[in-house]
Amino acid sequence: TEYDFTGVHILEPELLADIPLEEGCMVGDVYGPMLEDGVEFNTSVNDDFWAALDNPDLFLETTKRVLDDPELFDQAPFPEPNEEANFVAMDAELDEEAELETPVFLGRQATLQADASAGPHAVIDGTTIGPHATVERAVIYGMGDVEGEWADCIAVAGEVAHASDASD
């Protein structure tokens, strides 16, 4: 087909029956036939930041891009960067012996205890990083108290997904 279409699809439930359970193509299997049948549907063009976040590798790569260049995604909920160019929310708790390696985002519910380290490319909120723990190239959210090494992963509310090239 001549169409190129990506992004978020909001579908009526009856359209789901037209999508093959096996690997399929939204344009070829759903939108192309609809256009050929003269069916009208709405679309929206967005010139702002967009990224595929389909798997941990893409999610972490996008996190890295946004932390490295915050102007890329102007809707990112970053506070003003501090003098080290890290993004630390006012309510975040950072022990004076904790270390940050730029760039890092610490949300309002983030705590780094003594000798903990975060960064580069770490996003932490809703989590306490225990003494001597490390977080790098990772997104840690809603994990409560954590210890040890957290690298090349996304950890949310008790679930952890590792990047495909990360060693366990």
Identify the role of each PLM range.
Residues 1-74:
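Catalytic-core segments of class I nucleotidyltransferases/pyrophosphorylases
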Residues 81-168:
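Structural signal for interior beta-strand "rungs" in well-ordered beta-sheet cores
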Residues 72-83:
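Short, flexible loop/turn segments with low-complexity composition
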